[in-house]
Amino acid sequence: RDCLLSRGLGDVYKRQVIGGVVGLFCLFGAGLIIPQNQKDAIPALQILAPTIFLSGILGVFRGYFQAYRNMMPTSISQIIEQVFNAAVSLLAAWGFINAFSDGTENSIAKWGAAGSTVGTGAGVVTALAFMLLVYGVNRRKILHRVEKDHRHQEESYKEIFRVIILVVSPIILSAFVYNVNAYINGYLFSDILGRRGGDAAQIGILYAEYATYFMTIINIPLTLSSTAPTSMIPEVSALYATGDIEATRECIDQTVQLSMVVSAPCAMGLAVLAQPIVFLLYGNSTGLAANLLILGSFSILLNGMSNISNGVLQAIGQQRIPVITAAIALVVDIVVVVVLLFTTNLGVYALLIAMVIYSVVVCVLNDRAMKKYLQYKNPWKEGYLYPILASVPMGIVAGCICYGLNIFVKSNFICLIVSIPVAAVVYLFAYLIISKPSESQLRRIPGGSYLIRIAEKLPFWQNN
């Protein structure tokens, strides 16, 4: 079956013609897709059209390596994609507004959205280039595997699509529920505040601080932390299939620790450095996005927990459970948003509260399911407490350096570029002191071999 994947790779490319047709339809038929009252969104969809086609090819490469339990290329490509997405979106939106906007509010929104979609395409193109490089490096091994394949059994496309639909549909539904949550909240926010007499322009500015500024920044560490559960799925699935529940639980523990080692310092860093980060990236921000980051950065931990639990349940064949929990969380989210917006003056903070509650509901329900099927208990001390404690001195050092330096150097960029590397070193030392990880634990962290060489030179570190 492994070799069948190698032979089938070429056949999959032929099916990309479907993606090409859809992309062309979005390019030339955008006016038919976009509602009459949203014609300003047409340029954004047209710019996005090539990305639809390229995303399919990128998915083929990622899926190929994932099938061989090699998750590193996929994980790295996801990080690269998000970084380029965020950076190019900002630059392209600024460039499009200056080049094509006539200065009116609608025109700025129209061309800003169009420019932002360039970032999506840039992220996909960069990730695809990386995957092509990885494929090129491994090409000889792949061809050698194909040449030695004499025992595979061809499967019809009907059978392949049947399996894909059965396995992937619940995962897609779960992702759909999660993503539609943002659209529903945006609609409720605008509609309810409008009914309460809010100014339309002011409502738009408030929502932009949340959806465009806050969420764009926070999605970068969320992508970093989501690579761990993605890479875990094949191994957990294989261990569970053999009936080795103890090894399955150990694999999940390792994933939790890896995810939190990344998520905890990101959350602390964004909370402490929220203001300089926001004003560096979005100079026209009112400052609301910085406040949202300070209050909502810990949601990175909650989202990391929910991503891991979703991945585990999907890996053990319980794909329907994440769909159900996401649907329940969506209902709770909607109720919270409606109640808070109608009964309080929290404004956009109501969306932040609802986002946190959504993640908590998913975590609690998924945790119950994991206890039922795996008798699993979260490693609260090793997985969560140690990284959080190590993040505290890191945050103190980062804040002191950044805000102290800002007294003399009025440049957010310089202050951040100096404080972040120093804070990272402090976090590494603090984590080694508090957690006392073994060599095998360090090796699982990205750049683990380099971390081991550093740790071996420290008098307080011992390889357990």
What does each model-identified segment do?
Residues 1, 222-244, 256:
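Helix-loop junctions and terminal segments of transmembrane helices
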Residues 2-16:
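Single conserved hydrophobic/aromatic residue that forms the stacking wall/gate
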Residues 22-180:
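Hydrophobic transmembrane helix module of multi-pass membrane transport proteins
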Residues 30-48, 271-301:
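Interfacial segments at transmembrane-helix termini and the short loops linking adjacent helices
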Residues 55-78, 298-328:
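Membrane-interface junctions at transmembrane-helix termini in multi-pass inner-membrane proteins
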Residues 72, 83-129, 133-134, 320, ...:
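Membrane-interface helix-loop junctions in multi-pass transport and translocation proteins
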Residues 120-123, 127, 131, 135, ...:
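Transmembrane helical elements of multi-pass membrane transporters/channels
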Residues 400-464:
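Membrane-proximal transmembrane or re-entrant/amphipathic helices at the cytosolic face
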